[in-house]
UniProtKB/Swiss-Prot annotation:
Belongs to the MoaC family. CDD domains: MoaC_PE (cd01420). Coiled coil: none annotated. One of its GO terms (biological process) is Mo-molybdopterin cofactor biosynthetic process. Pfam families: MoaC. This is Cyclic pyranopterin monophosphate synthase. It catalyses: (8S)-3',8-cyclo-7,8-dihydroguanosine 5'-triphosphate = cyclic pyranopterin phosphate + diphosphate. Its EC number is 4.6.1.17. SUPFAM superfamilies: Molybdenum cofactor biosynthesis protein C, MoaC. Homohexamer; trimer of dimers. One of its GO terms (molecular function) is cyclic pyranopterin monophosphate synthase activity.
Length: 160
């Protein structure tokens, strides 16, 4: 059953009023593939627009905080932590991991996915002048903790 649909099939925001406040956490990732020269430019700090990783990290944090403004039926959440790790993977990729946490009545999967996605889009935006062939891939939820549905880890599903 899709929780965002009412009995007539109309989209509605899920009512979480009666749900218990619990600790919740989600980790998502995205990968940006690029030419090796582009990755080297980022790593050397020689990009004309500045520190690509720093800007992407801030963009991801901001995106997580504003997810409810982008995805229509998401609840506005009081996130207690948003962390992004960006790692160069030679010869041609950047892996972005976003982790969101809160004590609340609904999960933070969409916030983590949004953070990773927007960080990847920011890398694309900053580097498109030197590499229009970049590809954003593998946007996925890696792990989710807390709430009624419990613990999910991607590897447990056999999708690693």
């Amino acid at each position: 059953m899709l929780t965002h649909l009412d009995s007539q099939g109309r989209a509605n925001m899920v009512d979480v009023t009666e749900k218990a406040v619990t600790s919740r956490e989600a980790t998502a990732e995205a990968v940006v593939r690029m030419r090796p020269e582009t990755l080297q430019l980022i790593q050397d700090g020689g990009h004309p627009k500045g520190d690509v990783f720093a800007v992407a990290r801030i963009a991801g944090i901001q995106a997580a905080k504003r997810t409810h403004e982008l995805i229509p039926l998401c609840h506005p959440l009081l996130l207690t932590s948003v962390k992004l790790e960006l790692q160069a993977e030679a010869p041609d990729a950047v892996r972005i991991r976003a982790r969101c946490r809160l004590a609340g009545q609904t999960g933070v999967e969409m916030e983590a996915l949004t953070a990773a996605s927007v960080a990847a889009l920011t890398i694309y935006d900053m580097c498109k002048a030197v590499d229009r062939g970049m590809v954003i891939e593998q946007v996925q939820l890696l792990e989710k903790l807390g709430g009624k549905s419990g613990h999910y880890r991607k590897e447990e599903e056999g999708q690693a």
